[in-house]
Amino acid sequence: MAILDLSAIALRLTTIKTQDKALFYEHISNLVEGGVTILEALSSFSDKTDNLRLKQEVLTITEFVRSGDPLSTALKKLPRIFDRGEIAVIEAGEQSGTLQRSLVS
């Protein structure tokens, strides 16, 4: 018989608000614009956010990026959180060299 981990279930049910994602994009954009790598920016955000669900997802994104995925590909792996429109804008920014601008557009 499995024991339910209620804290894990509660965490999965916690939503990530649009405002929280906007802060995520702004934080990453500011750091990338300042010359910080995506990995360092993701790590910085996960250290600073109070949203435990978003922190968990950013740690997952960090692992995908660390293994070689571009940010857009890492986000595609979390479709319940990041929609196609967001990902398309980020992917265009990666391809054009304007990622920091695409994160806040």
Predicted segments, located by residue:
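Catalytic metal-binding core of the metallo-beta-lactamase
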Residues: 1-105
